[in-house]
From Swiss-Prot:
<dbReference type="Pfam" id="PF06793">
    <property type="entry name" value="UPF0262"/>
</dbReference>
<dbReference type="InterPro" id="IPR008321">
    <property type="entry name" value="UCP032146"/>
</dbReference>
<comment type="similarity">
    <text>Belongs to the UPF0262 family.</text>
</comment>
<protein>
    <recommendedName>
        <fullName>UPF0262 protein PHZ_c2197</fullName>
    </recommendedName>
</protein>
Amino acid sequence: MADDARQKHRLQSVELDEESLAAVSRDQEQERQIAIFDLLEDNYFAPEGAEHGPYDLRMGLVENRLVLDVRGPGYERRHILSLSPFRGLIRDYFMICESYYQAIRNSTPAQIEALDMGRRGLHNEASELLQTRLKGKIETDLDTARRLFTLICALHWRG
């Protein structure tokens, strides 16, 4: 992807809807902030019909649907996605992450690596699904989709 396209179509801000967020631990809040920072550092985000960015994104959950409010120069749209196709992936991702964090404390490096590979594989699968679900609405690269999936999970974290 050309650097020019990456500069023209990028997110400049990301906000998670406060009403969609549950109270979480300090570690989970830090993970949210890191995910947003990483997303803003490097992303490709090209809404269909928008000439150029940068864009502001607000993410939230409404009636078990993902709501993406996107604003940019001459562009303002709300995209709503059903989360049903993601339910199993989100559940499995949380389970493998919990196992991974427990393994860090008690397991061998080989066991930790195996769990980490599984976690990354699930993350990739969910990211590819997100790209498919956004087709015709918003184009992203895989890394941007991965970071967006992390934030979708952040909206589902419960304390």
